Regions:
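Structured, non-membrane catalytic/scaffold regions adjacent to prosthetic-group chemistry
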Residues: 4-300
């Protein structure tokens, strides 16, 4: 089914609080996708030629039945609407009618082994299609130029490093605890707004974990592995003082450079409203028990 094809779903108009969904135009024109550009606007144009079909998602690691899924396999797992709040760590948010299926359905098919405790996700690595993965360009984005044109050694954040060991090494990697991954709210999205996912929003398949900051919701997923040890994510490696493994939305734990107590909600209004941020992005009744007894100021 082509990227603009309609899905058998009717986009919702509001969440459980009665807040309206973000206009599709805003959803497609504003966001973060560093694999393409550091700019928050213009991603659509840069990502327009990304090849998203055919696509394969390999699932392995500590599982009884490793498997490679194509897009038809994934869509056969069900495509239902999930209207979720999406809260960026940068203190802006959207309300998005995703279309997809609980990640648990896929994990049940491969049967995690008893020793599996975490799930590691990996995104597409293709610098020819994703110019932001070109280390020379990325080094310039973060404030310093490469030492050599071929970027065999780059100066990143003031430190001379080899691209292979750079704190900004691609591909993009994320992780969840297994119980988080198996939670009913955690989905793999194949569409949004009653259409297939656009390239700029993570096509053809992305993770959505609505109670966590949006950088956890990795885009263009090509590999999922069940593992025993906590994965080190892209941003944990790049900026560990700002990005923890859990990344639960928490108004009481400020970002080192700004408060997380409020957020700019994109609703298509002028001006856009500023709303109080809710613990776990408003999903505390469903997920707070997962972190019982944990110090969430340390496990951020």
């Amino acid at each position: 089914m082509p990227g603009g094809a309609k899905l058998p779903a009717d986009p919702g108009t509001a969440d459980e609080f009665g807040d309206p969904i973000t206009p599709l135009k805003k959803f497609r024109s504003y966001g973060n996708y560093y694999e393409f550009t550091r700019a928050k606007t213009g991603i659509r144009e840069v990502a327009a030629d990304l090849a998203t079909s055919p696509w394969q998602l390999e699932v392995g690691g500590l599982v009884r039945h490793p498997r490679v899924f194509d897009l038809d396999d994934l869509r056969r797992l069900g495509e239902e609407e999930h209207v979720y709040r999406m809260r960026c760590v940068e203190a802006w948010s959207m309300l998005v009618p995703w279309v997809g299926f609980p990640l648990s359905r896929l994990l049940d098919l491969v049967e995690p082994a008893p020793e599996a405790r975490f799930v590691r996700f990996e995104s597409l690595h293709d610098p020819q299609q994703m110019p932001g993965q070109d280390m020379a360009q990325f080094a310039q984005w973060v404030g310093s130029a490469p030492i050599a044109e071929d970027c065999q050694v780059c100066r990143v954040m003031g430190e001379t490093v080899d691209p292979a060991t750079s704190p900004y090494a691609w591909p993009y990697v994320e992780g969840l605890r297994l119980d988080e991954a198996m939670h009913d709210l955690t989905i793999l999205a194949t569409g949004a707004y009653d259409k297939r996912l656009p390239a700029e929003n993570g096509a053809p398949v992305r993770l959505v974990v609505p109670w966590k900051y949006a950088f956890k919701s990795i885009k263009a997923v090509v590999r999922i592995d069940l593992v025993e040890e906590m994965p080190t994510s892209f941003w944990m490696r790049a900026m560990p003082e700002e990005h923890g493994f859990y990344a639960n939305v928490n108004p009481d734990v400020p970002h080192p450079r700004w408060s997380q107590g409020r957020e700019l909600r994109f609703l298509g209004e002028d001006p856009e409203p500023i709303l109080p941020t809710l613990p776990f992005n408003g999903y505390a009744p469903q997920v707070a028990h997962l972190y019982e007894g944990m110090d969430l100021t340390v496990n951020f």
